Every structure is written in C-alpha cells, then in structure tokens.
Amino acid sequence: MKHLISLLAFSFLIGCDAEKSNKTKPPEAISVSPNLKYEIKGDAVAITRCDKKASGELIIPANIEGKPVTEIGTFAFSSCYGLTSITIPDSVTSIGDDAFARCASLTSITIPDSVTSIESTFSLCVSLTSITIPDSVTSIGEMTFLGCNSLKNITIGNSVTSIGDYAFLRCTSLTSITIPDSVTSIDKQAFKGCNSLTALTFLGDAPEIANDAFEQSSPTIYREPDAKGWGDTLAGRPVKLITEKP
C-alpha cells in the first residue's frame, strides 16, 4: 500500500473524520515533508520515493501511522537535485542501493548507527564534502561514493570489513583516508582516479586487495609497525611505517 504524504490532504481527512463523529479523536498529525511516498510493510514503514522537486533541508520522520520507519528504499531520493540536507532517523536499519544517488546539491547527511550496509548509496553526490560511516556498518558496497568529487573528509567506522568495487572511484578531492583494522578486503578500482589522494593509513594487517585498486591514483601507504602481512608495496604503491609519516 503506497501513500503520498501531504499535509493538506492529511488535514482534510482529519476534518472529514471529525465531521463524521465527534466521539472519534482524530489521529495525531505527522510532521513530515509533504512530498514523501511510503509503503507499510507489516509493522514497519519503508520510504519509497521523494518528489524530485523537493529542495532544501528534509527530515525523514521516525514514525508514520504509528509504525517505525525502518527502510529507505532503492532509488528513494535518487536525482532529488534540490535537496541540500537530509536527516535520517535512528529507526532506519536498511538503506537501499542508489537511495541518494545523484543528489547533486546534497552537502550534509548523517548515517544513523542502526544501518549495517551501504551500496552505491551516494554515487554522484557531487556537493557532498564530508561523511561519517558509523561503527554499525560492516561493508562499503560497490560504487557507494563513486564520483563524489567534492568529498574531502570521510571517517570509516571500526566494523567495516570490506570496501567494494569502485567504492571511491573519482573522489578527486580526497587527500587522505584512515582504514580501520577491521578491513580485510578492498576490491577492484576502489580508489581509481582519486588523483589528490596522497596517503592511506592502515591500522591493521594487510588486506586482500585488487591489483588495480589504486589505478590512476598515487597514494603512499602507511602501516602500523606490528601489523602482519605487509611487504614493500600494496597494489603497486609504496608502503611505509606510520612513524615515517610526514
């Protein structure tokens, strides 16, 4: 069952219910953008779409019709070019593929620590400058930040174990990243075209990594002195001790 949330329509329905029976208390109004579509899934709610004309700041409600919002669906906010800031409630546990892809004006978004995985979620968000991936997330899927060419600062949570194909492809403003010791694999072209990237600091053992992970990028790799599995290079890039970091 899909709905279009509309404050005007919602107020109208309340008025109609009140006219039918003055004994029935109207439902409490939902403070939410009028442009969201959602779907009831059992005891929970999934946000399925946002009007592409939406602009400025948007707050996703934690509850709709008395049920928690737990999911942001695939392509839900894709190509909402006018949105600059989105607040996601802590009730959300799942964010679908491409959920915020091509939100070209988006500069600020917080991933709640209830989410466990992201994939192609923010691709081509060309105005996004910084983001924190919470400790609840265990994987950064393929193309998650592809083409986010304004992204300068990223904090990767301590539970991430894998970085997928093209995850940071052409993030041309990134200069340095710290990789937590939880990361065990980095897939193909994960950092391709990150031509400003000069330093990757690894806090754990050497991960399994695709040979082309740093294609068209020239970072120096820094590692902990007591970490295992390291050689003089990683995917063709020089490896040094953290103590040698400038």
Where are these regions (language model features)?
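Positively charged n-region of N-terminal signal peptides that target proteins for export
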Residues: 1-5
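Residues that act as N-cap/strand-start positions at coil-to-secondary-structure junctions
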Residues: 30-32
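C-terminal motif of bacterial Sec signal peptides marking the signal peptidase cleavage site
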Residues: 14-15
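Short secondary-structure subsegments characteristic of cysteine-rich extracellular domains
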Residues: 10, 77-80
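Consensus positions within tandem repeat domains that build extended binding/scaffold surfaces
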Residues: 74-76, 96-99, 119-121, 141-144, ...
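Structural signature of tandem-repeat unit edges
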Residues: 35-45, 53-71, 81-94, 104-117, ...
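Bacterial Sec signal peptide processing site at the extreme N-terminus
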Residues: 18-27
